[in-house]
């Protein structure tokens, strides 16, 4: 079905900033979709996009089997912006020449604008940009003019205003290109003729109508975790079909302090939704008893969740649809043609293939910040809208080693202290995730009072991120770190040392397991 809104098509060549391109387009209130570069010309015609963006990628266009689009795309009469590899591909396919650069360009560079065309409309002189490439354009295709240059790249940008084809060798989508959003705005509104009419209000209206039409009189089931993703998905479906939706919340015993009680109260009492709460902590503890391998933990918990969920679903009789809070980054991180699977993801592919439900994934095209906005507009309580991401297996993968009731209690208490202090410092919304990891296979010597102690260290992890695809360790104030450390060591029995993890992603992941 054709999209009801003006659409920008982003073609994915495997670059590290590709999702960021889509995010920037959405920030300008223009709907966009990302598709593999192998998409057919017929599919593009059916989509009828206002413009196409070719992303960056790790390949070189002159290599054998380098990713390339169907050349017929250039005959559609649709504006195209090529970014980094995307620009080089345009050059290569349209008759120009790309070669290896004498010196690579990585990081900040000064771009001299030589033609105020397309993305550079209204700009002149030198602007800062972010480069990440080892190849350069040597000869422009017929019809193009150079529109920007750097010390190492004579054609750092190009323009063919007649066909509305543009290319930039740098990355306008990253914050390190300060005028990058202006360039994106110029392309979307000036070149493609977009009006910026896509909003979260529109999204809600359209999703509610689409869900209502699809479900009809059918019964809908939702596995509710209490996180922002499944909560917003459930609330959106509830807005569409009301009592036809039943939510199942499985308390596996690995939640944070008082979290299960808060989830049940919110959805059953405050939001008036049909909620079945299953207390299954003993079942889950039995499944992970003696298990220390992280992937085995994840799979054991995931499999047991499926069994509990299936049992509850069977009690409801005929159910036609299943709601999942899948987001766009979930799909990418669980593996696509251009992104390797990093670890078993708890949302995507977590339910058995033989379950006789049709999937409803109303948030599948959204990023986390958009989901939060939808939640706010639907009236979801602030503490859930801004709840930090929490892994499906919960605290089970934050206890390194075997899980016991004692280790879970220690971790819960320490984690709650971090939550309290970060919130009190006014930093909770600025931080993507902040939590404690408890390595039960390690003990450290300490001195408390007049005696020596031999207890667990607690690892504090706090990161900043836009979408969890990349993350940086949070520069928490020393005074806050000191307060957290003092409270944990003094108030949590079993911990005598606190350390702070200052690893970014990559090379690390946000979670330890």
Swiss-Prot record:
The gene is guaA. ATP binds at residues 225-231. It comes from Heliobacterium modesticaldum (strain ATCC 51547 / Ice1). Homodimer. This is GMP synthase [glutamine-hydrolyzing]. Its EC number is 6.3.5.2. GO terms for cellular component: cytosol. It holds the Pfam family NAD_synthase. Pathway: Purine metabolism; GMP biosynthesis; GMP from XMP (L-Gln route): step 1/1. Keywords: ATP-binding, Glutamine amidotransferase, GMP biosynthesis, Ligase, Nucleotide-binding, Purine biosynthesis. SUPFAM superfamilies: Adenine nucleotide alpha hydrolases-like (SSF52402), Class I glutamine amidotransferase-like (SSF52317), GMP synthetase C-terminal dimerisation domain (SSF54810). It comes from the Bacteria. It is an enzyme of class 6 (ligase). Catalyzes the synthesis of GMP from XMP. One of its GO terms (molecular function) is GMP synthase activity. The active site is at 84 (nucleophile), 171, 173.
């Amino acid at each position: 079905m054709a999209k009801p809104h003006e659409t920008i098509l982003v073609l994915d060549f495997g670059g590290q900033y590709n999702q960021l391109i889509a995010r920037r387009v959405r920030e300008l209130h223009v709907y966009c979709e990302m598709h593999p570069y192998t998409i057919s010309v017929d599919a593009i015609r059916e989509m009828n996009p206002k413009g196409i963006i070719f992303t960056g990628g790790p390949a070189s266009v002159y290599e054998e089997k380098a990713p390339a689009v169907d050349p017929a795309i250039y005959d559609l009469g649709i504006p195209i912006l090529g970014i980094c590899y995307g620009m080089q591909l345009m050059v290569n396919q349209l008759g120009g020449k790309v070669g290896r650069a004498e010196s690579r360009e990585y990081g900040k560079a000064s771009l001299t604008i030589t033609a105020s065309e397309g993305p550079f409309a209204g700009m002149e002189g030198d602007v800062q940009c972010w480069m990440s490439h080892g190849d350069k354009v040597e000869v422009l295709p017929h019809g193009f003019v150079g529109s920007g240059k750097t010390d190492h790249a004579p054609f750092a940008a190009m323009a063919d205003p007649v066909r509305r084809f543009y290319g930039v060798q740098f990355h306008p989508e990253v914050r390190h290109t300060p005028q990058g959003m202006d360039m994106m705005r110029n392309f979307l509104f000036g070149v493609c003729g977009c009006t910026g009419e896509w909003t979260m209000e529109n999204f809600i209206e359209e999703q509610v109508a689409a869900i209502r039409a699809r479900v009809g009189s059918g019964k809908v089931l939702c596995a509710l975790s209490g996180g922002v993703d499944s909560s917003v998905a459930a609330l959106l479906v509830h807005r569409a079909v009301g009592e036809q939706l039943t939510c199942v919340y499985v308390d596996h015993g690995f939640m944070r302090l008082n979290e299960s009680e808060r989830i049940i109260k919110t959805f059953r009492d405050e939001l008036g939704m049909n909620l079945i709460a299953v207390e299954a902590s003993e079942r889950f503890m039995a499944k992970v008893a003696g298990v220390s391998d992280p992937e085995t933990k994840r799979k054991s918990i995931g499999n047991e969740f499926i069994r509990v969920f299936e049992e509850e679903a069977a009690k409801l009789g005929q159910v036609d649809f299943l709601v999942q809070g899948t987001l766009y980054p979930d799909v990418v991180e669980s593996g696509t043609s251009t992104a390797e699977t990093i670890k078993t993801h708890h949302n995507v592919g977590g339910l058995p293939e033989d379950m006789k439900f049709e999937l409803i994934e109303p948030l599948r095209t959204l990023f986390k910040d958009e989901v939060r906005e939808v939640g706010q507009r639907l009236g979801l309580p602030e503490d859930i809208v801004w709840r930090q991401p929490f892994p499906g297996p919960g605290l089970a993968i934050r206890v390194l080693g075997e899980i016991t009731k004692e280790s879970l209690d220690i971790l819960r208490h320490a984690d709650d202290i971090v939550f309290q202090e970060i919130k009190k410092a006014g930093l909770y919304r600025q931080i993507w995730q902040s939590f404690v990891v408890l390595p039960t296979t390690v003990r450290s010597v300490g001195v408390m009072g007049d005696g020596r102690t031999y207890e667990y260290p607690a690892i504090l992890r706090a990161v900043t991120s836009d979408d969890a695809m990349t993350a940086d360790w949070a520069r928490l104030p020393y005074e806050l770190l000191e307060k957290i450390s003092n409270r944990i060591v003094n108030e949590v029995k079993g911990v005598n040392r606190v350390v702070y993890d200052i690893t970014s992603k990559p090379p690390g992941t946000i979670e330890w397991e």
